[in-house]
From Swiss-Prot:
Family per record: Belongs to the RecR family.
InterPro entries: DNA_Rcmb_RecR, Rcmb_RecR, TOPRIM_dom, TOPRIM_RecR
Organism placement in taxonomy: Bacteria, Pseudomonadati, Pseudomonadota, Alphaproteobacteria, Rhodobacterales
Organism: Ruegeria sp. (strain TM1040) (Silicibacter sp.)
Gene3D superfamilies to which the protein is assigned, alphabetical: 3.40.1360.10, 6.10.250.240, RecR Domain 1
Record's protein name: Recombination protein RecR
Amino acid sequence: MAAQDNSDIEALIALMAKLPGLGPRSARRAVLHLIRKRALVLTPLADAMSRVAETARECLNCGNVGTSDICALCEDETRANGELCVVEDVADLWAMERAGVFKGRYHVLGGTLSALDAIGPEDLRIPRLVDRVSTEGVSEVILALNATIDGQTTAHYIADQLSGRVKLTSLAQGVPIGGELDYLDDGTISAALRARKEI
């Protein structure tokens, strides 16, 4: 490192290293690239990040991320109200949308139940899910949770809460045990959604 004060650059590298998939070395390379491409990438990126910091918010209805209190998916009157797809986080919702197969509504839990991390039902959007099933005319809840231990524990808990109230299904073939939706290709997600099974 040169003798001049690079504290701002080092601070940016440290922040970038906190992003998923970036370690200290990749963050350093990314920051150096941003600096080299200041006008083309760094300045527009900084402007976009500033706008997102001001405008991004969680949809009050489903938990998706957007720039208004109710997201575009919830406002879309062409979507099927009877089907509600439950996912762990926004990345999973976006993965389902990329697959282009599901045309119903979504519900983002905001995580999974976890005894190790002391995350219980009240820490997630499970009470809101139960309320939506009761008030929105939902006929089927599709549990599109990751095939992890915490994901399956959460699915069983939700199934217990909604048992007898609504048809419950889960994604079938194509989602490997231990797999996460955000890492699957669109075809795999499509096949899994079409072959869902009742719980």
